[in-house]
Amino acid sequence: MLTIALPKGALLKDSIRLLQSAGLDFSAFLEPGNRQLQILDRQERAKALLVRNSDVPVYVEYGQAQLGVVGYDVLREKTARVAQLIDLRFGGCRMSIAVKASSPYRSVLDLPAHCRIASKFVHCARDYFHNLDLPVEIVPLSGSVELGPITGMSEAIVDLVATGQTLRENGLVEIETLFDSTARLIANPLAYRINADGISELIEELRQSVTQAIAATC
């Protein structure tokens, strides 16, 4: 049976809606009070796992799920060995560098050498500054990275930004965008190659759904 890893949080509702367009119903995950982490499609064609966004590529890479939906930011950070198949065009956000609005920094090149950068996305941050040949110290944080510049622990942060409201409310401003991120459909490479459990047919249905959604907005 085909297993699909779905992300908890902001991407879940759109992920379920997309799969419904291909005849797979995992809407039980959205029911109030639901605590199930694994459910069958109502027609028992497939199974879904509800996992942390950052864990989706891990389940797919190791074969516990043949397909998964995950943000591109996670794929850049995790560098998992998975096949990236479709840009699903939802969950749009950007990986940005932000500083205190009152600071003198208005460009990443204004940042002093060996300054501190706070981030949950350590690999993305380190890779970006390495490519700029700008030596910095990456300070790993698990949450509320905005406090880095506010408390003086760091000169800047690297974090996901959707509307920018959280930054503004905390007196921060974006000075650079590393990359844009949207939800992606990923697959276990072996399962994709051998068309395990009819995976290719479902992928094509999802691709058509995304294409139709794009056409409807044009």
From Swiss-Prot:
GO terms for biological process: L-histidine biosynthetic process. Its EC number is 2.4.2.17. Pathway: Amino-acid biosynthesis; L-histidine biosynthesis; L-histidine from 5-phospho-alpha-D-ribose 1-diphosphate: step 1/9. GO terms for molecular function: ATP binding; ATP phosphoribosyltransferase activity. It comes from the Bacteria. Keywords: Amino-acid biosynthesis, ATP-binding, Cytoplasm, Glycosyltransferase, Histidine biosynthesis, Nucleotide-binding, Transferase. It catalyses: 1-(5-phospho-beta-D-ribosyl)-ATP + diphosphate = 5-phospho-alpha-D-ribose 1-diphosphate + ATP. The keyword Cytoplasm applies. InterPro entries: ATP_PRibTrfase_cat, ATP_PRibTrfase_CS, ATP_PRibTrfase_HisG, ATP_PRibTrfase_HisG_short. It is an enzyme of class 2 (transferase). It is found in: Cytoplasm. One of its GO terms (cellular component) is cytoplasm. Belongs to the ATP phosphoribosyltransferase family. Short subfamily. Heteromultimer composed of HisG and HisZ subunits. PANTHER family: ATP PHOSPHORIBOSYLTRANSFERASE, ATP PHOSPHORIBOSYLTRANSFERASE ATP-PRTASE. Lacks the C-terminal regulatory region which is replaced by HisZ. Catalyzes the condensation of ATP and 5-phosphoribose 1-diphosphate to form N'-(5'-phosphoribosyl)-ATP (PR-ATP). Has a crucial role in the pathway because the rate of histidine biosynthesis seems to be controlled primarily by regulation of HisG enzymatic activity. This is ATP phosphoribosyltransferase. It comes from Synechococcus elongatus (strain ATCC 33912 / PCC 7942 / FACHB-805) (Anacystis nidulans R2).
